[in-house]
A protein has these predicted regions:
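Extracytoplasmic/ectodomain regions of membrane proteins and secreted proteins
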Residues: 29-152, 197-318
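Juxtamembrane interface at the cytosolic side of transmembrane helices
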Residues: 2-26, 151-199, 312-357
Length: 357
């Protein structure tokens, strides 16, 4: 009997320790997202993904790549073939024609001087987006395809709150301790099983790779350079179509229509680029605006859970507490003994003679 009482006492102490641990783990899971401003950061992540989603499709990326090829072909033919040919017809050297364009059409002159560099920078953005398409698609499923990133906070608060409440009930009502341990263990199983079921580890790894790849794009200097490049190309495109070509046509004693025919026949890449230039410049401006408007969203998203930023860290901050709950709870259920049993004492029977005394 003494051994039974000792075992019951040991089991009771073990249960209380485990229940106390459940409360502590639950408090950690509940406080963590609030302390790290996860609601605000996850909302910023959702805004970022929503903004970029239309631009990270196969069709959108293919269009961006086509724009890049069109502009590259136009720039190469313009600088290596068309301008030298026009210089010859105008009885100028290429250097003289360049000086003439710079003096009379400054936007065209500035644009031509920077064209290859600007094209290279936008090509870098296009390459980054294309290379990160797969990572984006995975990250866009955090936590699941039907739950938005803002639900990440609830994935901490709900299990954390349950662990605190169930653990507190078990501590306050010793007779319910075993049942509360079983329920908290079930919470841990749901957390761990849920993370594994939705492949959260691979999704968060993809998110970290994407965040790292886009860091140079969202750097302050890069964003400012994108805006300057876009303004340069917009001004060049407008002045080239509206002023430069008509002026050259006049100098060559041609009508604008004749000049257009000449360009189409002899410089098809330039003609194709000129025809598509308004749409290409518009898409370029859209890309620039996309980056500019999401700098703050990116910075907040990249700081999950804290300044150094790592979605993988956030995954482990959910997985480790879940595993601890499962291990501690299962251990208490296995080694903590069964339910308390009330010992039954034998009741002595009365002797027959005692009834007659």
């Amino acid at each position: 009997m003494a051994n039974d009482m000792k075992n019951r006492h040991t089991s009771s102490v073990l249960r209380r320790i485990v229940l106390g641990a459940m409360v502590v783990i639950g408090a950690f899971m509940f406080v963590l997202p609030l302390a790290t401003n996860l609601p605000g950061k996850s909302a910023a992540t959702g805004n970022l993904m929503t903004s970029f989603r239309p631009h990270m499709t196969d069709a959108a990326l293919a269009q961006t790549a086509a724009d890049q090829r069109t502009m590259a072909a136009m720039g190469q033919q313009l600088n290596t073939t068309m301008l030298p040919a026009l210089a010859t017809q105008l009885h100028m050297t290429p250097a003289q024609l360049s000086a003439y364009l710079t003096a009379n059409f400054p936007s065209v002159g500035a644009g031509l001087a920077q064209f290859s560099t600007i094209l290279s920078r936008f090509g870098g953005l296009q390459s980054t987006m294309a290379a990160q398409e797969s990572n984006f698609q995975q990250a866009d499923q955090i936590p699941t395809g039907f739950l938005p990133p803002t639900s990440m906070t609830a994935l901490f608060l709900i299990p954390g709150g349950l662990l605190m409440v169930l653990g507190a009930i078990g501590l306050a009502r010793p007779r319910a301790a075993r049942a509360m341990i079983a329920l908290t263990t079930a919470v841990g199983v749901v957390v761990v099983g849920g993370l594994l079921a939705v492949s959260m580890s691979s999704k968060t790894s993809a998110a970290d790779r994407m965040t790292t790849a886009f860091a140079p794009v969202f750097a302050t200097q890069s964003v400012q350079q994108m805006r300057a490049d876009t303004n340069t190309v917009e001004a060049m495109a407008t002045e080239f179509s509206q002023k430069t070509l008509p002026a050259i046509a006049t100098a060559l004693h041609m009508t604008p229509a004749q000049m257009g025919t000449l360009v189409t026949q002899q410089f098809p890449a330039v003609a194709a680029g000129q025809a598509q230039l308004p749409q290409i410049v518009e898409r370029m401006a859209t890309a620039t605006g996309l980056v500019e408007s999401n700098v703050n969203n990116y910075n907040q998203s990249a700081s999950i859970p804290w300044s150094s930023g790592s979605m993988v860290t956030m995954f482990w901050l959910m997985m480790v507490p879940g595993l601890l709950v499962v291990v501690a709870g299962a251990g208490a259920l296995v080694f903590g003994g069964g339910r308390r049993r009330v010992a039954s004492l034998p009741i002595p029977r009365a002797h027959a003679g005692a009834m007659h005394s």
